[in-house]
């Protein structure tokens, strides 16, 4: 009897762990979640970060506080792995400097990130936010961040 009770207890514990891990992802996206944005550096407007991003060193060579800048592959892997984000098709495809910024987002987590690509194969994260919904016009995220 003790062995059966022990198995039931372990099964119950495993089930509660799985459920507790799934709950944040389920609760992260709400249709009424307001869109909010934060610059990569507190107190620095996002449009200023976008301008500076083209000349910042990659993060492992940075001397002080700055946005996360790294090889494109590293940025992409970080956004995919840590935040379940992927590029949003059609966002940032115009010709102005602000419009070359890439929008990455996650339906699962409800998060989004603005990435400033550079000609040397590196990129900088200039802003991030919450409230992503694939049904919204992508311009909402750029506008909320202070671009466009």
Q: Regions from the language model: what does each represent?
A:
Residues 2-111, 115-148:
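Polybasic/polar functional segments that serve as interface/processing modules
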């Amino acid at each position: 009897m003790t062995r059966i009770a022990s198995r039931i207890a372990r099964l119950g514990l495993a089930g509660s762990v799985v459920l507790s891990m799934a709950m944040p992802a389920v609760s992260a996206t709400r249709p009424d979640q307001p869109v909010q944005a934060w610059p990569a550096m507190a107190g620095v407007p996002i449009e200023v970060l976008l301008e500076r991003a083209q000349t910042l060193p990659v993060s492992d060579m940075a001397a002080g506080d700055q946005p996360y800048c790294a090889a494109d592959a590293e940025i992409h892997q970080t956004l995919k792995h840590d935040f379940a984000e992927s590029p949003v098709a059609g966002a940032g495809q115009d010709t102005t400097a602000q419009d070359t910024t890439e929008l990455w987002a996650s339906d699962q987590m409800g998060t989004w990130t603005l990435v400033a690509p550079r000609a040397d194969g590196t990129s900088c994260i200039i802003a991030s936010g919450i409230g992503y919904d694939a049904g919204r016009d992508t311009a909402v995220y750029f506008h909320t961040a202070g671009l466009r």
